[in-house]
From Swiss-Prot:
Cofactor: binding comment: Binds 1 iron-sulfur cluster per subunit.
UniProt xrefs under PROSITE patterns: HESB (PS01152)
UniProt protein name: Putative iron-sulfur cluster insertion protein ErpA
Cofactor: iron-sulfur cluster
Residues the record lists as binding iron-sulfur cluster: 49, 113, 115
Keyword entries, A-Z: Iron, Iron-sulfur, Metal-binding
Task of the protein: Required for insertion of 4Fe-4S clusters.
Molecular functions per Gene Ontology: 2 iron, 2 sulfur cluster binding; 4 iron, 4 sulfur cluster binding; iron ion binding
Subunit structure: Homodimer.
GO biological process: iron-sulfur cluster assembly
Pfam family, one: Fe-S_biosyn
Family in the record: Belongs to the HesB/IscA family.
Lineage: Bacteria, Pseudomonadati, Pseudomonadota, Betaproteobacteria, Nitrosomonadales
Superkingdom classification of source: Bacteria
Amino acid sequence: MGTTIHEETSAAQPPLNFTDGAASKVKELIEEEDNQALKLRVFVSGGGCSGFQYGFTFDEIVNEDDFVMEKQGVKLLVDSMSFQYLVGAEIDYQESAQGAQFVIKNPSAASTCGCGSSFSV
């Protein structure tokens, strides 16, 4: 299994900031699905208008190379390739007049797209 960080008890600054809002929303969605084995997987893939794009999915499997972060009893998974692009990023959940969505604020992104899910390094 991969590296696990329990954000509530970790004294050092974690490599990712999984916000309370995001953790609460993930917990709510898992409860709606009635499947406590689900974890939120965040990944980076090639594509989008700026070269890379973020993706979110639910997964039951923790891969050997996954970075695992736990907050409020829910787990966030990031594969090793995606992790290098997400170090220092904040994973949040926001609601606005345009809708509600998970968002990533990434200080490593040289530029981002108006869609909010695409970036370049």
